[in-house]
Every structure is written in structure tokens, then in C-alpha cells.
From Swiss-Prot:
Pfam families: TsaD
GO cellular component term of the entry, any: cytoplasm
Catalytic activity annotation: L-threonylcarbamoyladenylate + adenosine(37) in tRNA = N(6)-L-threonylcarbamoyladenosine(37) in tRNA + AMP + H(+)
Top EC class, one word: transferase
The enzyme's E.C. designation: 2.3.1.234
Binding site for Fe cation: H111, H115, D300
Any GO BP: tRNA threonylcarbamoyladenosine modification
NCBIfam families: gcp_kae1, T6A_TsaD_YgjD
Name listed for the protein in its UniProt record: tRNA N6-adenosine threonylcarbamoyltransferase
Biological source species: Psychromonas ingrahamii (strain DSM 17664 / CCUG 51855 / 37)
Subcellular location: Cytoplasm
């Protein structure tokens, strides 16, 4: 089985072709970072228009790179949500229309399910069940995963997602967009423990997250301490340490609560090396394993959508003729691949 995957949920156009026997055949990605840099963040209308320009050419490139034709495809998977509604509609319209024209099934994929399954693209892939930590610009979720489509959300952010907090704090520090990776780079120059930020919601029971207060704490610290380069680095490190410690504490709590020994970490923030290092130490201390996608599949990409779509199609899950985007779409509402439609 061979699937074309289309990802257009935010500011990256990702196209990929995945074969269940041969693996990933091609992977094309166009990032809109330069387009949005002058605005300090993603402008939804500009994002949608750029997806319109880039999606079809990237599909053509992916077919050529995979050395295959449209006749060799068994289905088209596209991100239907959650995300920016205009951006989602571009991918949904193109994916559903091409599937109709080529007489093959269309599969609507949940963006976060794509991230959750991204480590399955690697040789060292996790076995079910596992605990998943999904950390991105728009979401922070702790999920107990029994199988594909069998998700219990144990905790989530009640305000800013981890990646959003990184970006907002980076902006306070005067760093260019995208701020998260730049803040992590700046933190490498920081002096440990010069500033101590709170670890929000770690003294209370439960697995929910809250990161907006850290942004406020950072803003107050910047206003009080000034903006000389070393102080900026020290604040960046203190902020990053607070986020990572908070996430690690919640992961440890969730692993003990569920009894699971495998942890999957995915989403854009999962590329953070300090986060990876701390969670590796945690899992070693608990006698467990941690799994990540490769860096290029931490951020939005078509490969994860193609893979997730393939699993759905194998289970007989595909779309009718309607075209819809779901900017809000709870992960735990998805059907199990072991369920019949």
C-alpha cells in the first residue's frame, strides 16, 4: 500500500509518499519562516495563500522523487485538524479533490495523531502501549496510548502550550522568529541557577500544565534585571530549565500512575536537546525507554500524515465526498483502528 500525505495545518507545507513495504519514498517540506519573520509570528491569511502556491508543486516533486505515478497511489491522507482553519482547508480541498479525480480513497488525519505516530517512521519504534508527551507550539498533551486511535488524554495545558511559551518568552528577550529554537541556543550560554523560575502546577496533584505564568515571570525578571547579553542568556536558561523540569515531573507522575515503561516524545519542542537529555535520564532511572522522531520529523511534516493515513486506510477508515476542516478536534474522539465504521 502506498499513501500520499499532505500537511498544511500551520506554516509548513509538507508532502510525503509512504509505502508499507519500502518505507518512506519521498519527503518534501517548505517552511514559511521567512514569510512570517517580519511579523514576529504566523499570519494565518499569508500562511493559507502560501500553501495554495506550494502544495501542488511539492506533490509533483514528491512523485518524481519517489519515482512513482498517481496510478501507483492507494490513497491520499491530509491533515484535517486541528490547526489554522484556512491552512487546513487548502490541504483538505487539494487532498480530497485529487483523491476524487484519481479515484482513490481520501483519509482525514488528526494532526496530533500524526505527531504521536512519527516515531513509527524510525527503525527503533515503540511498541504499544506507551505514554505520549506531545509538545508543540499549539499543544501540550500527556496521552496514554493503548493502540492507534485508543487515546486517553491524562493532562493538557490549561493556557499556553510549551512551544507557545518558548516563542513568547523569546520575543520578550528580543529574539527573532521563530523564537523557541533561538531561546534554546541562547540558553546554552546561560549561567545555571542565577535565576530560579517556578515549576508551575507541580506541587498540585494531576497532570495538567500551565505555562503562561512562566512567561509573566520572565517578563518581570527582564524588566527588573535589564537586558545585557549575559543576563538574557541566564534568563533563557532559567526559563528553559523550568519548562523541562515541569514536563519531566509530570512525565514521571504519569508513568507511575499508568505503570507504563515506554515514553514517546513528539512535536516541535521534542527537538530540544536539553529536554531529550533530561527525559533520557528519567527513563533510565525508571528502567524504561524513551522514543523520539528524528529532528526533521519533530516539526510538521507530510511523512507522519502519510503514515497515520496508511494505518487508518488499512482499518477501513476513509472519507466521503465532503470536504471539511476541524480547527478544534479532540484527540480522544478518534476511532480505534480496531473499530469498524
Amino acid at each position: 500500500m502506498r499513501i500520499l500525505g499532505i500537511e498544511t495545518s500551520c506554516d509548513e507545507t509538507g508532502i510525503a509518499i509512504y509505502d508499507d513495504q519500502l518505507g518512506l519514498l519521498s519527503h518534501q517540506l517548505y517552511s514559511q519562516v521567512e514569510l512570517h519573520a517580519d511579523y514576529g509570528g504566523v499570519v494565518p491569511e499569508l500562511a493559507s495563500r502560501d500553501h495554495v502556491r506550494k502544495t501542488i508543486p511539492l506533490i509533483k516533486e514528491a512523485l518524481v522523487a519517489a519515482n512513482c505515478t498517481k496510478e501507483s497511489l492507494d490513497g491520499i491522507a491530509y491533515t484535517a485538524g486541528p490547526g489554522l482553519v484556512g491552512a487546513l482547508l487548502v490541504g483538505s480541498c487539494i487532498g480530497r479533490s485529487l483523491a476524487y479525480a484519481w479515484n482513490i480513497p481520501a483519509i482525514a488525519v488528526h494532526h496530533m495523531e500524526g505527531h504521536l505516530l512519527a516515531p513509527m517512521l524510525e527503525e527503533n519504534r515503540p511498541e504499544f502501549p506507551f505514554l505520549a508527551l506531545l509538545v508543540s507550539g499549539g499543544h501540550t498533551l500527556m496521552v496514554e496510548v493503548e493502540n492507534i486511535g485508543e487515546y486517553q488524554v491524562l493532562g493538557e495545558s490549561i493556557d499556553d502550550a510549551a512551544g507557545e511559551a518558548f516563542d513568547k518568552t523569546a520575543k520578550l528577550l528580543g529574539l527573532d522568529y521563530p523564537g523557541g529554537p533561538r531561546l534554546a541556543k541562547l540558553a546554552e550560554k546561560g549561567e545555571p541557577k542565577r535565576f530560579i523560575f517556578p515549576r508551575p502546577m507541580t506541587t498540585k496533584p494531576g497532570l495538567d500544565f500551565s505555562f503562561s505564568g512562566l512567561k509573566t515571570f520572565a517578563a518581570n525578571t527582564i524588566a527588573k534585571e535589564g537586558k545585557d547579553p549575559q543576563t538574557q542568556a541566564d534568563i533563557a536558561l532559567a526559563f528553559q530549565d523550568a519548562v523541562i523540569d515541569t514536563v519531566a515531573i509530570k512525565c514521571k507522575r504519569a508513568l507511575k500512575q499508568t505503570g507504563l515503561k515506554r515514553l514517546v516524545v513528539a512535536g516541535g519542542v521534542s527537538a530540544n536537546l536539553s529536554l531529550r537529555s533530561q527525559l533520557a535520564v528519567l527513563m533510565k532511572s525508571l528502567g524504561g525507554e524513551v522514543f523520539y522522531p528524528r529532528n526533521e520529523f519533530c516539526t510538521d511534516n507530510g511523512a507522519m500524515i502519510a503514515y497515520a493515513g496508511m494505518q487508518r486506510l488499512k482499518a477501513g477508515h476513509f472519507e466521503g465526498l465532503g470536504i471539511q476542516a476541524k480547527p478544534r478536534w479532540p484527540l480522544d474522539q478518534l476511532l480505534s483502528v480496531r473499530s469498524e465504521l
